C-alpha cells in the first residue's frame, strides 16, 4: 500500500509538472491583447480594413448591384436571358445573398475599424505623423462603410465600439440623419488631421488621400440632398441649397489638388490593363486595389472586368496568346440598355461608345 501511495504521488507530481509546462505556452492566436505591438502590425491591421473593398461582395465582384437602380445596364448576355429577379431587378428579398453578403461585409469593415481605433495607442515606436495618417484612414473607411449602409438601407444599426461578445447584438436602428452627420464629420476631420495630400502620395490612388475624402464628401452631400435623405421629413429650400453648395465646395477642392480628366477617354482603361497608375492627368482619385491570381494565398484579384467586360473564351490553358500566360476570359454578363446605346449614337460619340459598349466579342481562331 505504501508503494502504491508513493507511485500515485509521483504520478501526480509528474502530471503537475507536465500541466504547468503545457499551460505556460505562448499564445498562438492573434487577439487585441497580444497584437498592436509594432507599426508593422498596425499597418497590417489597417490593410485588413481596406481589404473589405476588394471582397467579392463589394468592388471585387458584385459592385454592379450597387448601380442596379439606374437604367443604363441589365443582366444577361453570353447565352443567358435577361434577369427577372434579384437586387439587380429591384425586386430582391431579404434572403438575397447579394443583400446579406454586402451588409455583413460593411459591418465587418466597421468592426475592424473600431478595433483598430481602440488599440492603436498600444503601438510602440510609432512616428507621430504616420500614426495620425493611419487613424485618419481608419476613420474615413469606417465612415465610408456607413455611407454605403445608409445609401442602401437608410436607418441602420450604428456603433463606434467593437463587438466584444456574442450577446447584445440586436442593436436598434439609428436615424440616418444622425449617421450622415457622423459620416461628414469623420471624413472632413480625417482630411484635416491626418490624411496626406494626393501629391504627397505621388498621386497613387490606392491609398486614401485628402482628395479621396473631399471627393467622397461631395458625393455624400449630393446624395444627402436627394429624395432618399428627405424621406419622411420636409427639408427646407435652404437646407437643400446648402447641401449642393457643400458638394460644389468639396468638388472644387479636388479639382485644385492636381486632378483633371485624362486627355483621352481610353487612357485610364489602357493604364489599368497595363497595371499602372494614370499619372498624366491624375484622373483617378481613389481605387480599390487588387492582387493575386486566385491560385495562391493572396486572392484579392477582383473580377469586375471578367463579369462586365468583353466576351471571350476561356484561355486559361493557353500561353502567350497576348504576350502573357493565361490572359483570362470575360463573361459579358452586363449588357447596355437601349437608352445608353442611343445616348452615345444620337450624340455621335463613336469613340467613347466603342470603349464603353463592345459591339463584338472575341473568338479563338
PLM regions: where:
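Conserved, well-structured interaction surfaces
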Residues: 39, 43-57, 79-153, 167-203
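Short, well-structured active-site flanking segments
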Residues: 25, 150-161
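Short helix/strand-bridging catalytic loops that position acidic/His residues to coordinate divalent metals
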Residues: 164-171, 202, 232-239
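Secondary-structure transition into beta-strands, especially the periplasmic turns and strand N-termini
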Residues: 5, 17-19, 124-139, 245-253
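An aromatic- and glycine-enriched ligand-binding surface/loop that stacks and positions planar moieties
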Residues: 21-82, 156, 180, 188-189, ...
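Bacterial Sec-dependent N-terminal signal peptides
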Residues: 1-28
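Active-site-proximal beta-strand/loop segments in catalytic clefts of secreted hydrolases
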Residues: 120, 161, 288-290
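Short linear capping/connector segments at secondary-structure termini
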Residues: 28-32, 91-94, 160-167
Amino acid at each position: 500500500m505504501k508503494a502504491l501511495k508513493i507511485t500515485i504521488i509521483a504520478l501526480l507530481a509528474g502530471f503537475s509538472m507536465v500541466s504547468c509546462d503545457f499551460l505556460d505556452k505562448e499564445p498562438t492566436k492573434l487577439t487585441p491583447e497580444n497584437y498592436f505591438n509594432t507599426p508593422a502590425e498596425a499597418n497590417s491591421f489597417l490593410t485588413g480594413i481596406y481589404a473589405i473593398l476588394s471582397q467579392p461582395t463589394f468592388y471585387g465582384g458584385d459592385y454592379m448591384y450597387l448601380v442596379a437602380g439606374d437604367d443604363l445596364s441589365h443582366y444577361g448576355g453570353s447565352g443567358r436571358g435577361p434577369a427577372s429577379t434579384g437586387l439587380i431587378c429591384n425586386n430582391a428579398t431579404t434572403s438575397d445573398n447579394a443583400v446579406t453578403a454586402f451588409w455583413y461585409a460593411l459591418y465587418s469593415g466597421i468592426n475592424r475599424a473600431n478595433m483598430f481605433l481602440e488599440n492603436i495607442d498600444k503601438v510602440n515606436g510609432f512616428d507621430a505623423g504616420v500614426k495620425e495618417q493611419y487613424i485618419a484612414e481608419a476613420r474615413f473607411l469606417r465612415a465610408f462603410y456607413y455611407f454605403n449602409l445608409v445609401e442602401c438601407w437608410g436607418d441602420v444599426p450604428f456603433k463606434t465600439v467593437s463587438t466584444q461578445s456574442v450577446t447584445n447584438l440586436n442593436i436598434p436602428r439609428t436615424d440616418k440623419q444622425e449617421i450622415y452627420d457622423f459620416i461628414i464629420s469623420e471624413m472632413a476631420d480625417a482630411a484635416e488631421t491626418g490624411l496626406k495630400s494626393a501629391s504627397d502620395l505621388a498621386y497613387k490612388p490606392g491609398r486614401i488621400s485628402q482628395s479621396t475624402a473631399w471627393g467622397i464628401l461631395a458625393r455624400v452631400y449630393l446624395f444627402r440632398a436627394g429624395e432618399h435623405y428627405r424621406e419622411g421629413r420636409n427639408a427646407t429650400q435652404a437646407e437643400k441649397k446648402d447641401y449642393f453648395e457643400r458638394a460644389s465646395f468639396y468638388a472644387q477642392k479636388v479639382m485644385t489638388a492636381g486632378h483633371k480628366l485624362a486627355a483621352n477617354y481610353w487612357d485610364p482603361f489602357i493604364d489599368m490593363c497595363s497595371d499602372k497608375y494614370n499619372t498624366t492627368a491624375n484622373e483617378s482619385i481613389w481605387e480599390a486595389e487588387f492582387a493575386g491570381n486566385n491560385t495562391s494565398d493572396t486572392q484579392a484579384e477582383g473580377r469586375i472586368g471578367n463579369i462586365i467586360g468583353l466576351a471571350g473564351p476561356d484561355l486559361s490553358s493557353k500561353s502567350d496568346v497576348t504576350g502573357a500566360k493565361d490572359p483570362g476570359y470575360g463573361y459579358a454578363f452586363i449588357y447596355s440598355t437601349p437608352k445608353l446605346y442611343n445616348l452615345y449614337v444620337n450624340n455621335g460619340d463613336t469613340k467613347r461608345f466603342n470603349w464603353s459598349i463592345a459591339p463584338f466579342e472575341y473568338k479563338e481562331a
